[in-house]
Amino acid sequence: MDRVVRWGVLATGGIAATFAEDLRSLPGSEVVAVASRTETSARAFAERFGIPRAYGDWASLAADDEVDVVYVATPHSAHREAAALCLEAGKHVLCEKAFTLNAREAEELVKLARDRGLFLMEAMWTYCDPVVRRMTELVRDGAIGDVRTVQADFGITGPFGAGHRLRDPALGGGALLDLGVYPVSFAQLLLGEPDRVQADALLSPEGVDLHTAMLLGWSEAGASALLNCSIVADTPRTASITGTKGRIDFPPGFFHPERFVLHRPGHDPEEFTAEGSGAAGEGLRGLQFEQAEVARALRAGETESPLVPLDGSLAVMRTLDAVRDRIGVRYPADG
């Protein structure tokens, strides 16, 4: 693909708007169509961002011959339905995280994409951020020795009332899939899939997690991760990686960082940044990095991204399932 990458945006919520804003900064890519469950919402979104076509149903977007790739921005309870619809219509897909409600749904999407030879990627923007990529290079080059611990947290306060989507089991509510996916993905970026999962949580009257603490373990690596997520507590939203020869600290906002600090015995602290990194800068939020990776992969004829591999997304979903099993959270879609 050597022409402009033509995007369709499926859903019109806040993250879809951020996506459309950031895409304006990416040369060689443009949003050409948007879809919502209502034509009114789709048209309002199209007018806001200068998008030529607006659809009041998802199927019309999936059938649009002028769309190369669809960004699925629905709540995660609809990710499987929306992404499968687009894949079945022959569209490449970038799907928001959490990838799906459970690992079974994720496996179905991955199989569908692989069977059809289509590109599919979870929108884990953290993995595409140049600062995070710089960190992983340092860790893999042995800058802090063997990783022994990872600590990360992502908590916010609403308040989120009983009618909010984050409190609705049918919509995959709770802290884990909305926020916990970040610290879990961060730990697994460095250590892969854990072989031990422990968790404890505070549950809402509706049966979703308001706050979850996780302890993940990797027997062969001799490593562990202490992770927290919450929709009732404003946590620091920091991360730290400790190895046998040093430590890396991320300031608040570790999931879209502008910098990190490397600490090693006998050395002054070293601060690392990366060109064009972080969410700030020209009003961008940081989604341009995942957008650029999708465009690069499509132009290269790749059906999976090496930065956000599908096997990695499946492994994260298995961990999230294991955490929900430990804390007793089930969704209607689990069956």
What kind of feature is each model-predicted range?
Residues 49-111:
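Beta-loop-alpha module in the N-terminal Rossmann-like domain of NAD(P)-dependent dehydrogenases
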Residues 55, 95, 120-122, 250:
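Hydrophobic residues in well-ordered beta-strands that form the structural core
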Residues 277-292, 308:
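Active-site loop of classical SDR/Rossmann-like NAD(P)-dependent oxidoreductases
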Residues 126-198:
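Predominantly a Rossmann-like dinucleotide-binding segment in NAD(P)-dependent oxidoreductases
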Residues 108-126, 146-149:
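Rossmann-fold dehydrogenase core element
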Residues 1-49, 329:
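N-terminal Rossmann-like dinucleotide-binding module
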